[in-house]
Amino acid sequence: MSRRHSAEKREVIPDAKFGDVILTKFMNSIMYDGKKSVAEAIVYDAFDIIEQKARTEPLGVFKQALENVAPAIEVRSRRVGGATYQVPVEVRMERRQALAIRWIITAARGRNDKTMVDRLSAELMDAANNRGNAVKKREDTHRMAEANRAFSHYRW
């Protein structure tokens, strides 16, 4: 990792159907081997299922799920005099979003439903209702930070 220049942020184009930048980032995270059309199909089909089952706006469910999964605080390792401490630190907004997206996708891939569309729609609905593995991951992260609160003065 270069110390001279920080990488410049790339412009993310909003998705075609909803015109949302965060949704594009979500699709890009789902995508394998550059197959964006497959990722788009998975997300849009999952949104259709959410619309049928929840009878609400799927983008609202998606945003609520992201909000419920995003961590406010996490632990980072810090070495002090031969000992490694887990120091709780606040999470930047961009990282919160990235972690929430990653955790939702990981939780969806770990589910036992038949297709990725079913898994993703179920995980998004669960996350929007404060259930599911992605929310559990956030709770674990917060619990870990709370347990290591004594080391918060090592913050950098």
Swiss-Prot record:
Keyword hit for Oxidoreductase: no
GO BP: translation
Protein's UniProt keywords contain Ribonucleoprotein: yes
GO CC entries: small ribosomal subunit
Annotated SUPFAM superfamilies: Ribosomal protein S7
NCBIfam families assigned to the protein according to its UniProt record, in alphabetical order: rpsG_bact
Oligomer status and interactors: Part of the 30S ribosomal subunit. Contacts proteins S9 and S11.
Protein name: Small ribosomal subunit protein uS7
Organism: Methylocella silvestris (strain DSM 15510 / CIP 108128 / LMG 27833 / NCIMB 13906 / BL2)
